A protein has these predicted regions:
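Walker A/P-loop nucleotide-binding motif
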Residues: 19-37
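Conserved catalytic segments around the Walker B and adjacent sensor/switch elements
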Residues: 44-56
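Conserved NTP-binding/hydrolysis module of P-loop NTPases
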Residues: 48, 58-80
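Conserved Walker B catalytic segment
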Residues: 89-151, 159-160
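Conserved small helical "lid"/interfacial subdomain of P-loop NTPases
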Residues: 170-195
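Winged-helix-like regulatory helical subdomains adjacent to P-loop NTPase cores
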Residues: 212-288, 335-340
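Short amphipathic alpha-helical interaction segments
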Residues: 285-300
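Short, amphipathic alpha-helical interaction segments positioned at domain boundaries
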Residues: 318-346
């Protein structure tokens, strides 16, 4: 399901019309791909082309051939020849993106998961392809919209990039947007969408993908709809939300280093969060120095976030997933009901639940001299939250 978000689409097209390169950042299930496909429809297929870089990034030669074959936009110079080596293949890919033409106006490429060109760095002569791509796009007459799920990595890549790049963080859905989605599932019930939207929005943290899963479940419940029960069904071993969380969890972990240690830290934070570096290193039984490295790798793939020198899951639904599926035995019905109930209380009644659910502060957790302070973003790029 492609969620229409007109105001966000206007922000992107306004950025394009101003000569900038919008860079859309959002986590798993945030609607990046849906937004790019909607933009392709809005801009028109005659002058825009969506490309999934993650799917195409195999070898430079095969990637070039796949993109040239699939694209409706072609260069005016004629067919792209066969490259002699990997470096030439990547260069011709940049030439192709740079030289595309359209009879209906300036061509626009919508590059999904553009960071995945890093795959080419495994080949001879290609050491800094991400920076090469950014440098070429910055001066290209072609228009581009970029998207990625890796927020921290994009910020680092664009830290010294030209001001033409405009970072746009995809906002979470609000209750009004979820209500519009809900009409597709519970339209036949009086006040159904309006009644369900606030609870669904809070439970999924505004995630379009998770909202769609819950609303699908609610639509099949009949008259007695219960968002918490729908969440419990979705996070069951065979649930759609479980499958999506597992995909996100494993994808991000496999893009980081230290797989086993990182899973250990996520298990610790699933039990109790937020925790500081010293508390995590004690529980992990590793030195603060090693633990600090592990945490930086988790931050790099946006699995954890540090606020005030304390670490917590970036996505609360992933924390619920790890609490349920981080052990050797799948959860039973009673465990799922209990965990989902506790999660729902923190999301639906945060003010009332906070005093009862907040963990007791550690008695002897002195500030660790090895802890790094929070860094303010350093970048010349335009950023919109």
């Amino acid at each position: 399901m492609i969620v229409e978000r007109p105001s966000l689409e206007r922000r992107v097209t306004t950025s394009l019309d101003a000569g900038r390169i919008p860079v859309l950042l959002g986590g798993c299930g945030s609607g990046r791909t849906s937004l790019l496909l909607r933009l392709e429809h809005v801009l028109g297929p005659g002058r825009s082309q969506y490309l999934d870089v993650a799917a195409a990034a195999t070898t430079p030669e095969r990637c070039l051939a796949a993109i040239v074959d699939a694209s409706r936009l072609q260069p005016a110079t004629g067919p792209v020849g066969v490259p002699a080596d990997t470096r030439e293949a990547f260069g011709r890919l940049l030439d192709f993106l740079d030289g595309a033409t359209s009879t209906e106006g300036t061509p626009t490429f919508l590059l999904d998961e553009f960071l995945d060109v890093r795959t080419f760095e495994n080949f001879p002569g290609l050491r800094h392809v991400q920076r090469d791509l950014v440098a070429r796009l910055a001066v290209s007459p072609t228009r581009f919209v970029l998207a990625s799920r890796f927020t921290s990595r994009v910020h680092r890549l664009l830290r010294d990039a030209p001001a033409r790049f405009e970072v746009i963080h995809i906002p979470a859905l609000d209750a009004a947007e979820v209500e519009s989605m809900a009409h597709l599932f519970v339209s036949g019930r009086r006040n159904g969408a309006a009644d369900l939207a606030p609870a669904v929005t809070a439970l999924v943290g505004g995630s379009p993908a998770a909202a769609h899963i819950l609303l699908t479940g609610l639509g099949s419940m009949g008259a007695a709809t219960d968002p918490v029960a729908a969440l419990a069904a979705a996070i069951a071993p065979d649930g759609a939300l479980t499958a999506r969380c597992r995909e996100c969890y494993e994808l991000r972990l496999h893009r980081a280093r230290g797989y086993g240690a990182l899973k250990g830290i996520l298990g610790i934070l699933a039990d109790t969060e937020p925790l500081n570096l010293t508390e995590i290193s004690h529980r992990l039984r590793r030195t603060p120095g090693s633990t600090k490295d592990y945490l930086s790798w988790l931050e790099d793939v946006d699995l954890v976030t540090m606020r005030g020198k304390r670490y917590a899951f970036t996505d609360p639904l992933l924390r619920l997933y790890v609490r349920l599926y981080g052990g050797p035995v799948p959860p039973g019905d009673s465990q799922i009901v209990g965990e989902v109930g506790a999660y729902a209380r923190t999301r639906l009644l945060p003010a009332a639940a906070a005093p009862a659910l907040a963990p007791a502060p550690a008695a002897a957790a002195p500030p660790d001299p090895g802890e790094a302070p929070e860094h303010a973003p350093r970048s010349g790029i335009i950023e919109i939250d």
